[in-house]
Amino acid sequence: MKKLILSFLPFFLFAAAFAQMENPVKWTYSAKKIRGDMYELHMTAVLEPKWHIYSQDISDDGPVPTSFVFDKNPLVKPDGKVTEMGKQEKEYDKNFGMNLKYYGNKVDFVQKIKLKVAVATLVKGKITYMICNDKKCLPPKNVPFSIKIDPRS
């Protein structure tokens, strides 16, 4: 049994290393007070060269658009929709047979919120996104996030 486990060990190590290499996007999260009880939540994607992430504005028959779901929080009220800040590219994609909007390098997704009571809280949720390069697309991912809002800082 021990020999069997040892014979498969290199395979598992290779698979683990390969899985880590196939994560060409890094997410960071922050909150910025803009005035009084208003804040901006920043969910920023930094992509490795040649990779891109799709806009939130993609038709249903295309790739998976980037989307955000925020957990309910009685201390927070969203103000508008998530906006995109970055260099948006628009290009016809022959694989999907349509014009697509996407971002390379970096994109900052911003949600404005109002803090109803001046106490610290966490805004939690999940991001769903899909990334591609010129050779392949990775399966859609769901990534949980948590952003601390503290009116005292």
Predicted regions and their residues:
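Bacterial Sec-dependent N-terminal signal peptides
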Residues: M1-E22
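Extracellular/lumen-exposed scaffold segments
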Residues: F18-S153
